[in-house]
């Protein structure tokens, strides 16, 4: 009777915690469903205010009567052109403003750029027509009354309307250009809410069922992870809605897999320790208290390491990269809080039977001290030097291939793993027209320097045409309007011979800027190619500055947690080695298996954050247990027991996290597929090789000195 009274209070607290979590999720869950509506996927919006492309864009807006900028939708009609077919296509294209967007009463005319006309012109080879439909960049970035983004709806309406007239006149139509490519990008990210999330949950559920061999237990950690994701997603939505952070499709996808993976990892650690403690008591509340005491510190340290590493991204010059920092940190903090509150409450409410059919009994038997992990840890203890030398050499061999990794940026057409209509259209456009046709690089110049700048840049690499912006459209058979002058400034439109969003076009920008600045020191070079070049420059700067800051932060956290400088340096060194080994494998696979054209400049940074921060996670889980056991039985015996008792749960956690990130490969986008592969492979490498063999072998080799300067160095 006394035990019943004693247990009633913690049971009531557990019920209260669960009720509170249902209230929290009820508030934030519906907001998570709206997260896609606040996405921003336009590269130009991510640049810092001081970037030249941004400064140019600000001045280019002054040349419009409204606060807008042109965002062209290019429609390529491939086929033999005759006066009759040209007239038919031209007539139809000029009427697209009357098209109504699906599911709304809005017309395309509401989203056309003011002061710019729709135009159609033939290619020099007579085998294609190109329609330029200038959209209002600000208007298409908003939402329709049905809360759907404008741009994909406009692109879809153009495709549906122009296909019949094109085919009737012997043409194959392709909606491409910036609007078509970004519209297809929206479509790819649109799968995040459904396909990515459901697949991630399904994969994690299967792994948990295999790990626990229980038809019931797997539901509890997965439910906790869902509560964490809904809450984190709702918080992120509110921040993005109020323009505090930027959310793009990539950061939303990463948030989903990061929260589910991290929350499940923390849950595996807590449940494993809880099951272990249930073998030593009949009272589940006593067992949970002991388990909680053993895991709260490593979970808090692990989550804090990842969260702080992500927050370092706030130092990025790009707002989308900087936005990923707090987005990921919110996900990790909410995951920790959920697993340290909701999960214990659920486990206590359901009792021991939740482990059925393998219900732990109070038999005083330390079951985890037998089995394959006991054999592995004892084998390493028998010859640690051989173990760390062999694993070190293998990792160094993989790391040597990291120098062949291609991560110097990719164009939008190479961003897709498949071939959507916009990509096919852009490739064909480059066959019949200059690659930059319809989407020029723009130079803002002083009005009295138009001739000088034109002469300076007309023979620059990649430039096929230089024309000033005119004050209005040229009437049929009439004289051309005057050059448009605003506040003593004019705009030169440069047509490049390459796709404007390609790496090659971006490579032409520095020379164009050098020549333009020499002719007019006040000139500003902007446009799509300049934006991509400035984004690439900012990414390279981030790689050089943010990675060292993260390394310093992680070293300090490890030093405080383990009370040892040497152990912090050793652990960090092993994870960095694992990171470069992973990059080496990525280089081999991306170049020779998947055949990717390249990778984003941000790939090394994102891979570093997730691989190093998450890799340190598993070392924290291991070494906090090793430290706990070393205080009781000595360092070498402690590391043997630590590997034995944590081996299964940490490996399971690694498999879960690897599987969740691997799901990113389902999205038809190269950057996410690359990041998913890198994190999945890197996490498995870290859990199976680094944490299981290399770290224990090094600790055995170094001995008690690993704990310097703490008192444990004598154990």
Tell where the protein language model's regions lie, with residue ranges.
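Structured non-transmembrane domains adjacent to transmembrane bundles in polytopic membrane proteins
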Residues: 49-70, 80-179, 407-598, 620
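Short, conserved active-site loops that position catalytic residues or coordinate cofactors/metal ions
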Residues: 36-37, 71-72, 77
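Short coil/turn segments at secondary-structure boundaries
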Residues: 73-74, 390-393, 441
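N-terminal entry motif of extracellular EGF-like repeats
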Residues: 43
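Membrane-embedded transmembrane helical bundles of large multi-pass transporters/channels
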Residues: 1-40, 126, 136-138, 142-407, ...
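Short loop/turn and capping residues at structural boundaries
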Residues: 71, 250, 391, 468-469
């Amino acid at each position: 009777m006394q035990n019943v009274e004693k247990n009633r209070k913690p049971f009531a607290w557990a019920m209260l915690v669960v009720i509170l979590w249902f209230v929290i999720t009820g508030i934030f869950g519906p907001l998570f469903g709206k997260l896609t509506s606040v996405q921003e996927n336009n590269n130009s919006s991510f640049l810092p205010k001081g970037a030249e492309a941004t400064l140019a864009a600000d001045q280019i807006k002054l040349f419009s009567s409204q606060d807008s900028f042109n965002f062209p939708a290019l429609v390529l009609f491939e086929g033999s052109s005759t006066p009759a077919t040209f007239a038919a296509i031209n007539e139809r294209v000029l009427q697209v403003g009357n098209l109504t967007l699906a599911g709304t009463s809005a017309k395309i005319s509401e989203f056309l750029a003011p002061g710019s006309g729709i135009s159609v012109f033939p290619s020099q080879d007579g085998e294609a027509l190109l329609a330029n439909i200038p959209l209002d960049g600000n208007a298409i970035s908003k939402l329709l009354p049905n809360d759907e983004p404008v741009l994909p709806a406009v692109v879809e309406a153009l495709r549906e309307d122009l296909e019949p007239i094109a085919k009737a006149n012997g043409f194959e139509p392709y909606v491409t250009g910036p609007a078509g490519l970004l519209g297809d990008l929206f479509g790819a990210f649109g799968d995040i809410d459904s396909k990515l999330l459901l697949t991630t949950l399904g994969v994690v559920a299967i792994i948990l069922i295999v790990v626990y061999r229980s038809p019931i237990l797997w539901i509890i950690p997965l439910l906790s992870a869902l509560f964490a994701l809904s809450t984190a997603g709702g918080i992120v939505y509110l921040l993005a809605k109020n323009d505090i952070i930027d959310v793009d499709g990539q950061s939303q996808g990463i948030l989903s897999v990061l929260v589910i993976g991290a929350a499940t990892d923390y849950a595996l650690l807590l449940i494993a320790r809880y099951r272990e403690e249930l073998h030593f008591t009949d009272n589940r509340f006593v067992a949970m208290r002991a388990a909680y005491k053993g895991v709260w510190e490593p979970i808090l340290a692990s989550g804090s390491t990842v969260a702080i590493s992500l927050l370092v991204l706030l130092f990025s010059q790009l707002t989308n990269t900087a936005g990923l920092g707090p987005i990921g940190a919110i996900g990790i903090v909410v995951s920790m809080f959920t697993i340290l509150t909701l999960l214990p409450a659920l486990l206590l409410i359901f009792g021991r039977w939740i482990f059925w059919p393998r219900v732990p009994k109070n038999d005083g038997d330390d079951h985890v001290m037998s089995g394959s992990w006991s054999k592995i840890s004892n084998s390493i203890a028998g010859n640690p030097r051989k173990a760390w030398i062999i694993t070190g050499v293998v990792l160094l061999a993989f790391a040597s291939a990291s120098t062949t990794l291609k991560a110097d940026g990719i164009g939008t057409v190479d961003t897709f793993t498949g071939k959507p209509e916009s990509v096919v259209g852009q490739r064909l456009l480059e066959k019949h027209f200059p690659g930059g046709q319809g989407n020029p690089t723009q130079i803002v110049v002083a009005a009295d320097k138009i001739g000088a700048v034109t002469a300076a840049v007309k023979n620059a690499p990649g430039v096929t045409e230089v024309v000033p912006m005119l004050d209005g459209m040229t009437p049929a058979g009439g004289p051309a309007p005057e050059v448009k002058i605003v506040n003593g400034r004019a705009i030169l439109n440069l047509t490049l011979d390459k796709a404007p969003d390609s790496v090659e076009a971006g490579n032409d920008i520095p020379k164009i800027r050098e020549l333009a600045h020499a002719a007019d020191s006040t000139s500003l070079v902007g446009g799509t190619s300049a934006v991509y070049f400035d984004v690439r420059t900012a990414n390279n700067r981030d790689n050089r500055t943010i990675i060292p800051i993260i390394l310093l932060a992680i070293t300090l956290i490890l030093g405080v947690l383990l009370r040892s400088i040497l152990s912090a340096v050793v652990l960090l060194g092993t994870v960095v080695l694992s990171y470069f080994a992973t990059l080496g494998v990525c280089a081999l696979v991306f170049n020779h298996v998947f055949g990717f054209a390249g990778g984003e400049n941000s790939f090394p940074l994102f891979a570093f954050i997730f691989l190093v921060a998450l890799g340190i996670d598993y070392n924290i889980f291991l070494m906090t247990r090793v430290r706990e056991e070393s205080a009781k039985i000595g360092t070498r015996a402690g590391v043997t027991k630590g590997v034995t008792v944590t081996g299964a749960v940490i490996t399971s956690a690694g498999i879960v996290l690897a599987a969740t990130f691997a799901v990113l490969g389902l999205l038809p986008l190269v950057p996410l597929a690359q990041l998913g592969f890198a994190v999945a492979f890197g996490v498995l490498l870290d859990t199976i090789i680094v944490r299981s063999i290399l770290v224990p072998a090094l600790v055995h080799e170094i001995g008690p000195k690993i704990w310097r300067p703490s008192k444990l160095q004598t154990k």
